Amino acid sequence: MNPNFLEFEQPIADLEAKIEELRLVGSGSDINISEEVAKLQEKSITLTESIFRGLSSWQISQLSRHPKRPYMLDYIKRIFTDFDELHGDRAFSDDPAIIGGMTRLNGQPVMVIGHQKGREVKEKVRRNFGMPKPEGYRKALRLMEMAERFKLPVLTFIDTPGAFPGIDAEERGQSEAIARNLRVMSQLKTPILATVIGEGGSGGALAIGVCDHLQMLEFSTYSVISPEGCASILWRSADKAPEAAQAMGLTAGRLHELGIVDQVIKEPLGGAHRDYDQAADAIRKALAAQLESLCSMETDALINRRYERLMSYGNVVSDPADE
């Protein structure tokens, strides 16, 4: 099976293999097979549309972790210009799992901050598989406070399985670093836009996710724990991950229904990894539209709106018939 395809995409993989086989046959002979290839390509598109219309929460969770899915640096190259990366938390060290710096969106200066996973083995290890340590969150906080001083909007990109749970991270104050970010971001005197581009795992995601506008890519996820972790706690078996994913409501569509997410950004057919440029263009347009609206607001009104937005989470409306 082609490694670019997940298990539930096997019928698509088989069809794409046939198309590739026909192309190889046609390239080595005088037989015109363009019409047959076109028919199979059309069939592949129809099949992909059919499969992706009915994805389960677990299948979407798998897509959010796809090894070929674009990461933050892939989007920075396609969405922004003049990116100048800034390093270090000015207290301990620099954490490569968090990337941040000043850049421009359609010519407007902004501060961009986000998680970065690794693509190859060495890079995965260097970036700790996208799991930040306290110094990563303190670096993010330093850049946010810098953005506030220079009146730059803050754009965050969320893609992490969670904050690093190692002993060294706990010794250096992992929970304190996350909590401080939550507090400061809730009162930051500049617009904050957050985009979930892959996994949004627990406090590790939330530490750069307090915002005025939260948007998610169509096949990204946002949850308090991974489906496997939830299944291990509730059922004592990670095999129950599909059931856990369904119960958790971690998909962009479900979170939008619940009012947690403000906007769902449509991905290219088959997922963002099928077309980096198209996915980046969709994010760029969404960011530009929201940025114009938020930057026009008075600072006090912006912070009050953000506070009310946060306080609206978790409200329970009881049915009078049940009382």
Swiss-Prot record:
Domain CoA carboxyltransferase C-terminal: 32-293
Xref: Gene3D superfamilies: 2-enoyl-CoA Hydratase, Chain A, domain 1
GO cellular component, one term: acetyl-CoA carboxylase complex
Coiled coil: none
Location(s) in or outside the cell: Cytoplasm
Gene Ontology biological process terms from the UniProt entry: fatty acid biosynthetic process; malonyl-CoA biosynthetic process
The reaction(s) this protein catalyses: N(6)-carboxybiotinyl-L-lysyl-[protein] + acetyl-CoA = N(6)-biotinyl-L-lysyl-[protein] + malonyl-CoA
A Pfam family reported for this protein in Swiss-Prot or TrEMBL: ACCA
UniProt keyword Transferase, yes or no: yes
EC number assigned by the record: 2.1.3.15
One GO molecular-function entry: acetyl-CoA carboxylase activity
InterPro entries associated with the record: Acetyl_CoA_COase_a_su, ClpP/crotonase-like_dom_sf, COA_CT_C
The UniProt record lists the keyword Transmembrane: no
Annotated NCBIfam families: accA (TIGR00513), AccA_sub (NF041504), PRK05724.1 (NF004344)
PANTHER family: ACETYL-COENZYME A CARBOXYLASE CARBOXYL TRANSFERASE SUBUNIT ALPHA (PTHR42853), ACETYL-COENZYME A CARBOXYLASE CARBOXYL TRANSFERASE SUBUNIT ALPHA, CHLOROPLASTIC (PTHR42853:SF3)
Stated family: Belongs to the AccA family.
Function, as annotated: Component of the acetyl coenzyme A carboxylase (ACC) complex. First, biotin carboxylase catalyzes the carboxylation of biotin on its carrier protein (BCCP) and then the CO(2) group is transferred by the carboxyltransferase to acetyl-CoA to form malonyl-CoA.
Assembly mode: Acetyl-CoA carboxylase is a heterohexamer composed of biotin carboxyl carrier protein (AccB), biotin carboxylase (AccC) and two subunits each of ACCase subunit alpha (AccA) and ACCase subunit beta (AccD).
Stored HAMAP family: AcetylCoA_CT_alpha
Protein name per the record: Acetyl-coenzyme A carboxylase carboxyl transferase subunit alpha
Biological source species: Alcanivorax borkumensis (strain ATCC 700651 / DSM 11573 / NCIMB 13689 / SK2)
Phylogenetic placement of the source organism: Bacteria, Pseudomonadati, Pseudomonadota, Gammaproteobacteria, Oceanospirillales
